[in-house]
């Protein structure tokens, strides 16, 4: 049965000599697609360019769940990006965010609200210029949909415990952040993408808070892996 769905490209991997396996997040959860002979010189139908990281697509194809490979009959760009794939900083950010999503979105994920958040966030990212801190706000907002957004009450307390997700006056060396990094963490909580220009961070603070957020994800998500692109990404924003 052929169905039509909106989709966000999460990953694409070459399979064999000429095939491609693409993983996409849809309003009905994660879907995997096998595109046969897409690398073949005889392929005249579907371009590999459709399947760049975080592209927003509209796909007509089969709709099998549980990790089974689907086929694509037709694919179109749902929203055209104007800057993400032509700007090395944005492109690197997109690859990094796609790697994060690949680790946190499971086969059984079925969330229209998460899909809507991602769809809107990536359009905003494409349309705006001052996006050096976008990935930080994105990661923290993403925790709302993954079930471990920080408890915001008592934010006047001296520490934030990453393990418990709360502000506290009880210091635990392995779990707590404090001082300037705590202030940056507080600034990220509740901020809108439209207010990003007000967030002024040094490259050093940006890298430290990114490591804090990666640790926060590792604590709360079993099997979460730091993206392979993280070190290259950090170098670009040094």
Report residues per predicted region:
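Non-catalytic alpha-helical scaffolds and adjoining flexible linkers that form interface surfaces
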Residues: 1-238
């Amino acid at each position: 049965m052929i169905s039509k769905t909106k989709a966000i490209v999460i990953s694409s991997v070459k399979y064999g000599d000429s095939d491609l396996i693409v993983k996409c997040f849809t309003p009905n959860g994660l879907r995997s697609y096998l595109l046969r002979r897409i690398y073949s010189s005889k392929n005249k139908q579907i371009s590999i360019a459709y399947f760049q990281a975080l592209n927003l697509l509209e796909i007509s194809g089969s709709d099998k769940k549980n990790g089974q490979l689907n086929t694509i009959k037709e694919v179109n760009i749902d929203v055209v990006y104007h800057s993400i794939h032509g700007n090395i900083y944005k492109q690197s950010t997109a690859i990094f965010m796609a790697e994060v999503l690949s680790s946190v979105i499971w086969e059984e994920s079925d969330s229209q609200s998460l899909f809507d958040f991602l769809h809107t966030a990536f359009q905003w990212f494409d349309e705006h210029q001052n996006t050096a801190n976008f990935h930080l706000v994105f990661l923290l907002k993403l925790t709302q949909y993954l079930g471990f957004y920080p408890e915001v009450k008592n934010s006047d307390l001296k520490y934030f415990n990453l393990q418990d997700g709360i502000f506290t006056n009880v210091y635990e060396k392995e779990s707590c952040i404090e001082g300037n990094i705590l202030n940056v963490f507080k600034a990220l909580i509740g901020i809108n993408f439209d207010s990003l220009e007000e967030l002024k961070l040094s490259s050093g603070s940006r890298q430290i808070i990114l490591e804090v957020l990666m640790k926060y994800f590792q604590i709360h998500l079993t099997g979460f892996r730091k993206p392979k692109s993280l070190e290259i990404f950090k170098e670009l924003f040094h």
